[in-house]
């Protein structure tokens, strides 16, 4: 029993250490500005990250009670994976949308700001928890942004200066 507790603390410490050592920010496009935007693509990318967080959350919950080394190894890997994907969502919202696409001159600026902030808060909460309801809320919050960034076709040369 004491050995299991020691292993569990070692895994927790290892997980936390890996998260800090591997901390990176996701690049959500440039801030040159280049004038090339594909907002809908970034929404889809965030949804893909959220689905990955959902899968990671399910697997973390499945592996939580297992004590064999392989299961504990997989548990740590899924925790790290969940953290990285949630952090990527936060980075896309802050570095791309809030820095470049949400403008103070927009008539609905406050509403947009609140809805984008809600995505960041939801992503933070899924990092802190393994509750699938929080993942559902994250997906719902991301989907709430689609109305601002509908899918459209890019024409060849659309962003080139003449």
Label each region the model flagged.
Residues 85-127:
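Long, amphipathic, charge-rich alpha-helical segments that form helical bundles/coiled-coils
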Residues 26-70:
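Immediate post-signal-peptide N-terminus of mature secreted/exported proteins
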Residues 56-96:
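Alpha-helical segments in soluble extracytoplasmic regions
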Residues 17-25:
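C-terminal segment of classical bacterial N-terminal signal peptides
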Residues 2-12:
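Bacterial N-terminal signal peptides that target proteins for export
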Residues 31-48, 92-94, 113, 117-124, ...:
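Metal- and O2-centered redox machinery and metal/ROS homeostasis
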Residues 73-81, 109-113, 135-141:
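Short, charged, amphipathic alpha-helical segments
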Residues 43, 117-162:
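C-terminal amphipathic alpha-helix
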């Amino acid at each position: 029993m004491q050995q299991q507790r020691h292993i569990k603390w070692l895994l927790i410490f290892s997980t936390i250490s890996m998260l800090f050592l591997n901390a990176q920010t996701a690049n959500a496009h440039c801030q040159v500005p280049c004038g090339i935007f594909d907002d809908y693509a970034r929404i889809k990318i965030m949804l893909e990250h959220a689905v990955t967080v959902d899968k990671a959350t399910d697997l973390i919950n499945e592996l939580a009670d297992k004590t064999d080394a392989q299961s504990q190894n997989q548990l740590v890997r899924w925790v790290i994976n969940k953290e990285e994907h949630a952090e990527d969502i936060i980075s896309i919202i802050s570095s791309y949308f809030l820095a470049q696409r949400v403008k103070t001159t927009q008539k609905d600026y406050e509403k947009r700001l609140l809805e984008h902030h809600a995505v960041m808060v939801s992503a933070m909460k899924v990092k802190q928890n393994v509750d699938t309801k929080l993942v559902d809320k994250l997906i719902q919050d991301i989907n709430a942004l689609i109305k601002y960034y509908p899918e459209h076709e890019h024409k060849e040369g659309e962003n080139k200066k003449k």
